[in-house]
Structure formats: structure tokens, C-alpha cells
């Protein structure tokens, strides 16, 4: 009997600790997800990285420079969005995480080019003209997704906020007329 009580107390304590851990992890999980504006920023950065690798590998400096000039503001805003994501999710290690991601992104595009071999330039150089045809950051992000531009980011999207529930009428209060 005494043994059963001790076992129940231990089990109850473990359940309490598990519940507290889950409560504490909730905000951390929410912090590590990707906001919609951050998703756009990461997509734009992936396209920029793909075009940068293509410019270097395929001697398309003029096209890349035209892309950077046209979208200078959007590219800078996207970089700031990525910085903000890593500040939010990595705290004091944000700069190291940001640098690591940008390096990983460039390496992924470079490896993609190596795998494509002699087909890389013919397949990639049309992207310059198509990217330059976009008019804003949303167009660039959509273009990136439509073209399946490689992005090694695995962070899940944040869940959408639930819509607010309508207020309940107080007892004795009649519903509003429609």
C-alpha cells in the first residue's frame, strides 16, 4: 500500500514536470516558426543566391548586376527580414546563424550547379530575364516558389492566428437585430 502511494506520487510529480515543460516549450516553439513576411524574405534571398551562383558560373555579371540594381531596396529589406528572424529565434547567436544560413544557401546552389554539369547555364540563365520581369518583392517570392528555387530552410511556417470568437450575449440580453 505504501509502495503504491509512493509510486503514485512519483508519477504525479513526473506528470506535473512534463506539463510544465510543455507549457514552457510552447513559446519557444512559436518563436522558431517562420512568419509569412520572413518566408518571403527567405524566398527572395534564395533567388538572389541562385542568380549570384549563375552569374559567377555562367559569366552573367551584367544580368546579375541589373537584378541587384532593380531590386536593391527589396533585397535589402529581405536581408533585414532574415536578420530579424535569426534575432528572434537564435538570440545572441543570431549573427552566426545568419552567416551559416547564407553560406549553406550559396553552397547548396553551387552543388546544384555541379550536379547539373554542362546543363546548368542553359537551364539557369533564362531565370535572369524572368526575375527581372517581376515588379515587386511578392512577385519575386512567388517566382522563386513557382521555379522551385532551392532553399535549404526547414523551419515550419507559424500557425495562422485563430479568428476571434464572437462575443457571447449576456444572460437576458437579446441578440442584435440584423
Predicted regions and their residues:
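Bacterial N-terminal signal peptides that target proteins for export
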Residues: 2-16
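Sec-dependent N-terminal signal peptides
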Residues: 15-23
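N-terminal signal peptide c-region/cleavage motif recognized by signal peptidases
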Residues: 25-27
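Active-site flanking loop/helix segments enriched in acidic
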Residues: 34
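Short N-proximal segments of mature Sec-exported proteins
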Residues: 37-95, 103-107
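Compact alpha-helical subdomains of small soluble proteins
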Residues: 74-177
Amino acid at each position: 500500500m505504501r509502495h503504491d502511494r509512493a509510486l503514485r506520487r512519483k508519477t504525479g510529480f513526473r506528470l506535473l514536470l512534463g506539463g510544465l515543460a510543455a507549457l514552457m516549450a510552447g513559446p519557444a516553439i512559436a518563436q522558431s516558426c517562420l512568419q509569412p513576411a520572413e518566408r518571403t524574405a527567405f524566398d527572395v534571398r534564395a533567388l538572389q543566391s541562385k542568380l549570384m551562383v549563375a552569374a559567377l558560373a555562367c559569366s552573367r555579371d551584367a544580368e546579375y548586376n541589373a537584378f541587384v540594381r532593380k531590386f536593391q531596396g527589396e533585397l535589402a529589406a529581405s536581408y533585414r527580414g532574415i536578420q530579424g528572424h535569426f534575432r528572434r529565434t537564435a538570440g545572441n547567436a543570431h549573427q552566426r546563424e545568419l552567416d551559416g544560413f547564407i553560406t549553406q544557401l550559396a553552397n547548396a546552389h553551387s552543388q546544384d550547379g555541379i550536379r547539373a554539369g554542362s546543363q546548368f547555364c542553359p537551364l539557369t540563365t533564362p531565370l535572369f530575364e524572368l526575375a527581372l520581369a517581376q515588379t515587386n518583392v511578392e512577385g519575386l517570392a512567388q517566382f522563386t516558389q513557382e521555379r522551385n528555387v532551392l532553399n535549404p530552410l526547414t523551419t515550419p511556417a507559424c500557425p495562422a492566428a485563430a479568428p476571434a470568437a464572437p462575443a457571447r450575449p449576456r444572460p437576458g440580453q437579446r441578440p442584435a437585430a440584423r
